[in-house]
Amino acid sequence: MTTAQVKEIEFFVSEKAGAVTGLLMKPNEARVLLILAHGAGAGMRQRFMENVAAKLSNHKVATLRYQFPYMQKRTKRPDPQRVLTDTVRAAVAKAKKEAGNLLLFAGGKSMGGRMTSRADAAEPLDGVAGLAFLGFPLHPSGQPGVTRAE
């Protein structure tokens, strides 16, 4: 098992959204940092997100898990897409400052992955070498379609 330092961080998203928190888990000898957004129903401290970060840490992959503003404020309804993609960009900017010489990847679980891909499709995420998704719904359950894939 690899030893990792865990640090709580805060970063500013926008005047409207305010600041959010994140958890940087950085194992010794890390070479990569994955910026990891949570899904719609559970935040960065949800068991799945913690397990993913811990297992990646064992393979010398650092993670930056972060909250979207609605989860930070403990409201149930996700923020508008613009706020979510602005949060992705703010998380990437913060990760660049924290990463040192680590190679950056970005992604997330479900909605977090989708918002990361939308942010990158609109304008490539600065300094990000690739994207990684942990569950990526292209349509709501029971409603097949491809509009989210376009």
Which residue stretches match the model-derived regions?
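Primarily recognizes the serine-hydrolase "nucleophile elbow" in alpha/beta-hydrolase
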Residues: 88-150
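Short, hydrophobic/aromatic-rich segments at coil-to-beta transitions
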Residues: 2-10
